[in-house]
């Protein structure tokens, strides 16, 4: 299995104990790639007492590098989607671009990624 980028929506299911077969497989195989914004989103939504364990868990995963060229591509993706009448937030464009940068599968439940996938080479699946 190639790299698998995982959106916050799938992590929410994972941490709530809901079925996430593709994520479970990617974790077992060590192919999960974590967009930096997803770290912030996860940590902003948990109890302070859970933070150290969550940081340790997330810290063991591969963090997607986001060099300057990545952010240029994020802006270009947002612009291209806007030209098609599709509003995409910067965080969502960043997550999608993390997957596009590595030709990785993106796991998400967020419908915006389906619209991005129809307009780009983004490979998308549910968790």
Show where each model-derived region lies.
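Acidic, PIN/NYN-like endoribonuclease modules and their adjacent C-terminal/linker elements
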Residues: 1-3, 16, 96, 100-127
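Active-site neighborhoods of divalent-metal-dependent phosphate/nucleic-acid chemistry enzymes
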Residues: 21, 63-107
């Amino acid at each position: 299995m190639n790299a698998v980028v995982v959106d916050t929506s799938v992590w929410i299911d994972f941490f709530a104990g809901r079925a996430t077969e593709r994520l479970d497989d990617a974790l077992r195989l060590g192919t999960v790639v974590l967009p930096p914004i997803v770290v912030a989103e996860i940590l902003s939504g948990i109890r302070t007492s859970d933070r150290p364990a969550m940081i340790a868990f997330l810290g063991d995963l591969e963090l997607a590098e986001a060099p300057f060229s990545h952010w240029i591509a994020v802006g270009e993706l947002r612009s291209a989607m806007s030209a098609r009448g599709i509003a995409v937030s910067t965080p969502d464009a960043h997550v999608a671009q993390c997957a596009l940068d590595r030709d990785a599968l993106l796991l998400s439940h967020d419908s915006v990624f389906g619209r991005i996938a129809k307009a780009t080479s983004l490979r998308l699946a549910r968790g």
